[in-house]
């Protein structure tokens, strides 16, 4: 009937036939059966019975023929419109559908000439009322059916509440700032101001009351005290606005999801190692295993291990680690164990069955521990084999020579162990990508030590995975909190916070430290006090490990929104913490913007060229604009333009490894901005300070994240000599920055983006080694005073006594209030004070002289890798004595003050009662020095409380020197004898 011009079904638009022979009203079979089931057997248009013969059949035939011949185009047009209407979904506007059906009804009515006479009282056709009534009933029936189906499929009320909660959490902030209580912070600030005032009055007294009988000692002491006051200001005021932060990992999951369909951003992990004999492969392997097992979608995690020593031992141990990871990773995720470094998990002295409900856990844990012990034996066998290098060099398993036999002259090497093309775990699940990287090294090329290795990893990862975020760890820092990456993403992926965040820094926490923390390895005062203070300004400094970077910030770009400019060139502490108006762009950014405009015009001109390929045009533009900054790699340059990460679509997967080898070649960085404005910055052995400083100068801010469970843990050098060498390297890096063009005293003023208190903290970071000079002089003063009988302070008046007492009280109260808001213990504070003196009179002094010699004579400073503890005995390394020249200055000061105390008491015994009063002040001064050096003295004594031979020889030598000096001074000669001798000298007897 459709071929003869009958339109589709008037109800649903499907293929129809003429249900009513009288008026040719079109209905499909389904709608006709539905009407019959509901008892409707009459036509909705004419009211006649469905299927009844037409009383005027001939006339009807003529009319139908007329419809076919005369109105075929009209019927076709209507058929088109109805077909389109039938394709509308049930959720579309019902008015549109009704209007289409009305048009169809009117068209059929006018053509057939039937029913126009059947109208109701209002003049509206009866058939139209019936059609609309029928349609409404049908819609109500469908709506009730849908409602019943939806109710059947609806989750329980509890699940609906949880879904609503998740939806609410998805729009909540992912983190918040927890300000320090005013009850704690206000008194703290008041005491700081009071201490500053008292310090000024104290200096006024000291300068205006010289000691003429000991003018040299007095002048030395005043200069030292002024420097200490300046150093205190640099250290104290950046702690003016301390804050705490809290993260909401559940909200992160609610917003971005979890699992394979998660919207979480990919993260590339960087692990760097140099010498596997000083950095045991088992420690590096535990770090890698903890990374592969983090609680994060596996397809979004990649681990890059940089072997800067090109050691086959590292390569083979990493291959063993990749195989063991196939068992370890699913075990960790199945039972949610913490930490996920097997060495530290199995060595925990806790109830490992707590909160475990799986019956198979004990059995699988026992089997896993056995597998790990077998894995350790294999690693130990590799280490034992590597102790003696063959004359012909190392040979790989396939019989070919190891390319890295010469660590100073070898090609670049990359090996992908796990990932999309690698093996899966034993449960059949995908594993994170694990990549071994050893950059090319050739004679005559600068390699820039760790900073150069990190920049090589930046380029390799950009070519292979190009995650928008980078998290770097030292080889001895394992992931202690499997949710650490999610903690960082709570800041990075929060739209209200993460736009201007260049990195999230986690505090360093350590295992294997003695209970008393003799050498302040935990560094609690810095990580729990200073870093919280900096977080309230522009953010914490970068400390070299445990830091999650935004990749675009490493490329030298500024933040999307620039920070405020100060109203004047001199800014007070109050304006440094407060937001201001949007800053103007610096000259460098204006130049960069102009370059972008030039590029846009170049793009416009290139588009005018006919048949010019889009990909070739973009590559040409990238090379013209970025090759001087990023180097000659089109794939890498294109990856830098992808702010959200991901491998460029134009990159050929088959050539990515070849491109990755190219970007780690030794000459790739020549004539580029790498190490100057891009990546880790060169010029100091402490590249971390310099890199973070450059980012803050560009206007970025950083975040300090302190989760309840420490994110990462590492090993610290608890041996005295190793600890001092570590401090020496840090101090040397600060001296190098101080003597370079990047010194915070004069660098970074152009854009005004570095807050003044933040600059003050960086100045303190690079100036503190120079405190060793006045500190050594000040520590020698009490012994000199005891030996000479003179003192640096004149007889105290009442006013002077008030200033001295006020200064001491303000120092004590400031420290107590600082402990109160930070939550650290008094023992940690005292250990920090002791090691400040120990490091200041030893490592810092050597760092100053080495840095000056490097600047004047061009002597290069050798980077010494801190050996990681491998002693099986608990705290075994603590008692090992390793002699080094760094120990000479503190040993000399210690012996000098001990000799001075003995000499002082001897002099008092011979001088009478009057000399005991001044003696107490001098002895207290000397005992203050000895108390601060007491941990150093214990370190010299060793495990058996016996002094090593070398120290005995030094002590005898120094004691002899000072004994001769003592005899020269003759403290036993009384004043009357001295007067007589001097009088006789004036006469010729």
Swiss-Prot record:
Zn(2+) 2 binds at residues 20, 23, 43, 46. Binds 2 Zn(2+) ions per subunit. Residues 138-149 have a biased composition (Basic residues). Residues 206-213, 794-798, 857-884, 938-946 are extracellular. Glycans are attached at residue 862. Its EC number is 2.4.1.12. Pathway: Glycan metabolism; plant cellulose biosynthesis. The active site is at 308, 688. UDP-alpha-D-glucose binds at residues 272, 278-279, 308, 449. Residues 138-158 are annotated as: Disordered. Mn(2+) binds at residues 450, 474. It catalyses: [(1->4)-beta-D-glucosyl](n) + UDP-alpha-D-glucose = [(1->4)-beta-D-glucosyl](n+1) + UDP + H(+). Residues 362-389 form a coiled coil. GO terms for cellular component: plasma membrane. Zn(2+) 1 binds at residues 9, 12, 28, 31. PANTHER family: X-BOX TRANSCRIPTION FACTOR-RELATED. Belongs to the glycosyltransferase 2 family. Plant cellulose synthase subfamily. This is Cellulose synthase A catalytic subunit 4 [UDP-forming]. It comes from Oryza sativa subsp. japonica (Rice).
